[in-house]
Amino acid sequence: MLAARRLLGGSLPSRVSVRFSGDTTAPKKTSFGSLKDEDRIFTNLYGRHDWRLKGALSRGDWYKTKEILLKGPDWILGEIKTSGLRGRGGAGFPTGLKWSFMNKPSDGRPKYLVVNADEGEPGTCKDREIIRHDPHKLVEGCLVGGRAMGARAAYIYIRGEFYNEASNLQVAIREAYEAGLIGKNACGSGYDFDVFVVRGAGAYICGEETALIESIEGKQGKPRLKPPFPADVGVFGCPTTVANVETVAVSPTICRRGGTWFAGFGRERNSGTKLFNISGHVNHPCTVEEEMSVPLKELIEKHAGGVTGGWDNLLAVIPGGSSTPLIPKSVCETVLMDFDALVQAQTGLGTAAVIVMDRSTDIVKAIARLIEFYKYESCGQCTPCREGVDWMNKVMARFVRGDARPAEIDSLWEISKQIEGHTICALGDGAAWPVQGLIRHFRPELEERMQRFAQQHQARQAAS
């Protein structure tokens, strides 16, 4: 997703760091991972059980939801803040703080919650699994989140290619209406709340929150300039919060089990459990729920069956979806999978889509393919992105062939820096970072490829 990824470029401002809290009396944890089954939030992640209302009720969904609603917005926001939950769509912004922006006196305009289910980030499929196998968690999360911010309704914007998932979600919404769980007097709480599904049309840029809002309004999906921010002027000109599917879906469980319980997982400022997608050169690609701050090596070896050919065959990993810089094997040995640890490693958690590449990978060609994707998906609104990504794509194509000069490596780095931070949305950043990761860690590979091409060219000339 494209939700304000620039926060990944550095540490969070000090004014928001105090928002992360946990149980200060508990001893500080030093090891992470091996999440117990009783602590898993997504208990039907693999679709082994009934996803409809009857099955959801048997797994604890919709349990005491009325009590949660009756406790009011301040109590819900308090639990979310205590939990230390950070946005699961890529930016990692404190969820309780973000939702509290909506909790202000009404000016007569209705408030809306928009759920970003436009999951288009290459390598990412966690939200798809939630919608396909646990849709009632999302519907209940919309109700609880909507209550926290005083929203009148939720719009779930789902990727156009997710046809079956959208069908399951629509069935879950209908069941919730028929059971009186949403709609008029939701759960008997006296609170009215509606949920609507909006289908996307395949544009990656609509994963950016303001482009998504434009699309819901029936306009071309192009990001808006901010300010005004969606919390002031969002969908249909009304106060709006845009939140990721996973962020919304975990909120009822946090309220039921307590923010302190959720804060007990992971390192400080990196609380909770997290869905990880592991794909690429692993023996068993999977989506798994694990504790935040789990070591990357443990995540791959325990849940994905290890790297094909063994750990020593590992070349590099993209840890957070295609828009985060890759890290080489030497970094993968010890890095933890959380926001702060990956920022220190000059990359980011992003969507937690772990793309594993072994030594058979043509790393230059792999990154070039990602740049081609971003060139295609750029909306063209900003000159640095429109022209810069096209330029990067052409240079990377020459790097793949080796038909370039070593000085062009530095030129490409400068181009990426001119794109990063100079666009309306974060798509430009997402296109620049893979290139920066490649140059930072695999510059010798680029130079060797150019040298090899030059030698072959000289040999052909000599032969002719």
From Swiss-Prot:
Lineage: Eukaryota, Metazoa, Chordata, Craniata, Vertebrata
GO-annotated molecular function: 4 iron, 4 sulfur cluster binding; FMN binding; metal ion binding; NAD binding; NADH dehydrogenase (ubiquinone) activity
Binding site residues for FMN: 199-247
Function: Core subunit of the mitochondrial membrane respiratory chain NADH dehydrogenase (Complex I) which catalyzes electron transfer from NADH through the respiratory chain, using ubiquinone as an electron acceptor. Part of the peripheral arm of the enzyme, where the electrons from NADH are accepted by flavin mononucleotide (FMN) and then passed along a chain of iron-sulfur clusters by electron tunnelling to the final acceptor ubiquinone. Contains FMN, which is the initial electron acceptor as well as one iron-sulfur cluster.
Transit peptide limits: 1-20
Gene3D superfamilies in UniProt: 3.10.20.600, NADH-ubiquinone oxidoreductase 51kDa subunit, NADH-ubiquinone oxidoreductase 51kDa subunit, iron-sulphur binding domain
Reactions listed under catalytic activity: a ubiquinone + NADH + 5 H(+)(in) = a ubiquinol + NAD(+) + 4 H(+)(out)
Pfam families: Complex1_51K (PF01512), NADH_4Fe-4S (PF10589), SLBB_2 (PF22461)
Protein name in UniProt: NADH dehydrogenase [ubiquinone] flavoprotein 1, mitochondrial
